[in-house]
C-alpha cells in the first residue's frame, strides 16, 4: 500500500459525494469520497492518503490526463513474467507500482529515468481515526 501524508485544502460536495483537494508538499491531489461534507473546518486538517500499487499508472511522457499526475524517478525495476514492480522516489517518499509486464514492456522506462505516475481520484482512500469527515 502506498501512503502519503497530506492536508485538506478544499472540499466540494454534492448530495452523496465529496471531492477533496489535498496538498502533498507543494503538489495537489484530488480524491473522491462516497459521502457528502460541506464542513469548511476541515481545511488544513492533516490526513493520510493510501492507494494500492496496482492503481499506479506509469507513463514515459506527459500524455495521459488525470487529476493526479506527478513526476518521480525510477529507483528499481523488477520484471516478472506477469507483473513488473517499479519502485519510484516521489520527493522523499517511495511509491510502488505493480504493472502488467506486457504493458510495461511498451514503455521506454529504465532505472534512473524520470517518469510520470498517476492515480485516479476514485482509487485513493482517506485513512482517518474516525468515520466521516
Question: Residue spans of the language-model regions?
Answer:
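A generic beta-sheet turn/junction motif
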Residues: 15, 24-26, 51, 81, ...
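Short leucine-rich amphipathic alpha-helices used at interfaces
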Residues: 33-34, 81
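Short, conserved beta-turn/loop elements at beta-strand boundaries and strand-helix junctions
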Residues: 11-17, 77-83
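Glycine/charge-rich catalytic "coupling/switch" loops of P-loop NTPases
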Residues: 2-5, 28, 35-71, 102-133
Amino acid at each position: 500500500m502506498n501512503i502519503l501524508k497530506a492536508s485538506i485544502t478544499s472540499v466540494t460536495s454534492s448530495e452523496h459525494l465529496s471531492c477533496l483537494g489535498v496538498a502533498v508538499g507543494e503538489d495537489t491531489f484530488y480524491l473522491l469520497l462516497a459521502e457528502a461534507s460541506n464542513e469548511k473546518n476541515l481545511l488544513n486538517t492533516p490526513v493520510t492518503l493510501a492507494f494500492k500499487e496496482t492503481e499506479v499508472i506509469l507513463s514515459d511522457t506527459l500524455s495521459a490526463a488525470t487529476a493526479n499526475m506527478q513526476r518521480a524517478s525510477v529507483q528499481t525495476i523488477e520484471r516478472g513474467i506477469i507483473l513488473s514492480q517499479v519502485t519510484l522516489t516521489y520527493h522523499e517518499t517511495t511509491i510502488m507500482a505493480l504493472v502488467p509486464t506486457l504493458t510495461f514492456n511498451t514503455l521506454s522506462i529504465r532505472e534512473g529515468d524520470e517518469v510520470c505516475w498517476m492515480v485516479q481520484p476514485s482509487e485513493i482512500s482517506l485513512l482517518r481515526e474516525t468515520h466521516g469527515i
